[in-house]
Amino acid sequence: LPMFTIYKGEEGGAEPAGSVSISIEAGSVGLGTILPSTSVDFYQGEQLSSVVLRLLQNSGLDWRNDGDATGGFYLKAIGRGGITAGAAIPDDLMAHLEAVNCQMSGHDANWLGEFDFTMDSGWLYFVNGEYMNVGMSAYFPADGDEIRIRFSLYSGADVGAGTNGETWGDW
């Protein structure tokens, strides 16, 4: 398992600095919400990557990542038995992918992550509706943040965050 830091208050020790709401969504492949918005406490100085890893672990989800929770963290894949069962790219999104000659790829039944379905896919995250173009280990949550972790098939263009300037919609 990858290493990450868990910040935990002890008797009379540190109290949570606040809480955030985190959801995990895969509408781009027709799976909707994988994990509904869940309130998670965080501690002073804790990076979002540690908060997300704690949520994944407590929710029974597996993960693969690059880097670690304190630096260079990238969420590569989220896993659970049959996580991609019933996945289907919506027809209107498929039309956009075909129009740009997006290179399609296969996927694993138990994992959803980078290079699944397309060679431009991966997990992106948003804080309070804004796409964050920095790794989760570079973001320190604020009390009340609403965080959406979303699966994109084309560098964010399909989830309202086209990293190359293209935004097709919001699946």
Task: Locate the predicted segments by residue.
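Ubiquitin-like/PB1-type beta-grasp interaction modules and other compact soluble beta-rich domains
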Residues: 1-171
